[in-house]
């Protein structure tokens, strides 16, 4: 059995969030979205920047899993939002980070809770300031308590 590097999974998580965002914004059918990422994004060089090789199977699992279990995931996230908050109020990128993290906490028991939370906090740092990254940390920690 081959050991998948942490870097490859980190790249897969970031790509999954990007793919989920694209699906949300453009309503791209899942099979076309996955094909686009497989052919043109994962590990590709874009604007002279070479992206890390991603764990393609892990990427596929997160994207397909969020798509298949969106209602369940959104219910978990909604239950943990502060009073007066609803998912549509969240930034769309933030929502995809939370969905991907929640899916991993629910379905990927092979990955420990701390790793999942840390990885999605790192993804949040790619798009947001520290305050929002802390929000990801707190919400995913609460979801983890519900599902693990």
From Swiss-Prot:
Disulfide bonds: none annotated. The gene is nusB. One of its GO terms (cellular component) is cytosol. NCBIfam families: nusB. Belongs to the NusB family. Pfam families: NusB. One of its GO terms (biological process) is DNA-templated transcription termination. Involved in transcription antitermination. Required for transcription of ribosomal RNA (rRNA) genes. Binds specifically to the boxA antiterminator sequence of the ribosomal RNA (rrn) operons. It comes from Novosphingobium aromaticivorans (strain ATCC 700278 / DSM 12444 / CCUG 56034 / CIP 105152 / NBRC 16084 / F199). Keywords: RNA-binding, Transcription, Transcription antitermination, Transcription regulation. It comes from the Bacteria. InterPro entries: NusB-like_sf (IPR035926), NusB_fam (IPR011605), NusB_RsmB_TIM44 (IPR006027). Signal peptide: none annotated. This is Transcription antitermination protein NusB. One of its GO terms (molecular function) is RNA binding.
């Amino acid at each position: 059995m081959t050991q998948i590097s942490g870097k490859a999974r980190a790249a897969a998580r970031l790509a999954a969030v990007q793919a989920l965002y694209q699906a949300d914004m453009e309503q791209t059918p899942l099979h076309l979205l996955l094909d686009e990422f497989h052919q043109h994004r994962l590990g590709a060089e874009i604007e002279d920047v070479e992206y890390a090789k991603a764990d393609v199977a892990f990427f596929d699992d997160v994207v397909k899993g969020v798509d298949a279990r969106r209602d369940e995931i959104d219910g978990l996230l909604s239950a943990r939002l502060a009073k007066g908050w609803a998912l549509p109020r969240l930034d769309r990128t933030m929502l995809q980070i939370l969905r991907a993290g929640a899916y991993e906490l629910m379905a990927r028991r092979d990955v420990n809770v701390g790793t999942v939370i840390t990885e999605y906090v790192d993804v949040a740092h790619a798009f947001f300031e520290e305050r929002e990254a802390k929000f990801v940390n707190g919400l995913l920690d609460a979801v983890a308590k519900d599902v693990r």
